[in-house]
Amino acid sequence: MRKKLIINIGRQIGSGGRIIAKLLAEEFDCKFYDREILNLAAKESGFSEKFFEQNDEQKGFLKTHFNIRLPLLADSDFYKSNFSQESLYQFQSDAIRDVAKQNDRCVFVGRTADYILRDNPNCVNVFITSPMQTRIANVCERRGCTEAEARKLIENGESERAKYYNYYTAKTWGHAESYDLCIDASILGLEGTKDLIADFIRRRV
């Protein structure tokens, strides 16, 4: 029986963190969960998956969008009466815990999985960064946008991620003390970064 392993990846937008997470999943034969968690949470909760997507890693979404997003709710009096951002977070947390319990190896991208699974001894928590200009270039290439648009997308997106993470974890998003390992992916490239993290994981577990 192989050893259980859970890899939680936090990442700056445009850093290549999601790609590296997929490479690590292949390296360690793990199941990969990014937006897939939203689908599982939607099935468990009775909410539409679109609602989880629009609320994904954003704090305060419900306060500003409550009135115009109600059609995205599934047809359930229970969930309508218990409707709050905390309830969405709880459904998502339950989905992450269930996946971690049901699989011997998995990789989670974002969504405070490192905090949700903080009592699990099989976790390795990694945060992936890159210089702003590198991330802007990556976002421009991926989305076909201007540098100014890419910078705005990064700054707005990371502001939301930080608020979300800090609120639910009482830790600080992107700060070294919140993770086992932080690494700048621009130094070694995607494959090299994956190799370094993989070596760290083998030594760590």
For every predicted segment, state its role.
Residues 99, 106, 116-119, 138:
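RNA pseudouridine synthases
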Residues 119-143, 147-157:
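Conserved phosphate-donor/acceptor-positioning beta-strand/loop module used by diverse small-molecule
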Residues 9-22:
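Glycine-rich phosphate-binding P-loop
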Residues 3-12, 104:
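Pre-Walker A (Motif I) flank of P-loop NTPase domains
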Residues 62-71, 146-190:
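Small-molecule kinase domains that catalyze NTP-dependent phosphoryl transfer to phosphate-bearing small molecules
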Residues 42-105:
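ATP-dependent small-molecule kinase phosphotransfer cores
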Residues 31-42:
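Short beta-strand-centered segment that lines the nucleotide-binding/catalytic pocket of NTP-utilizing
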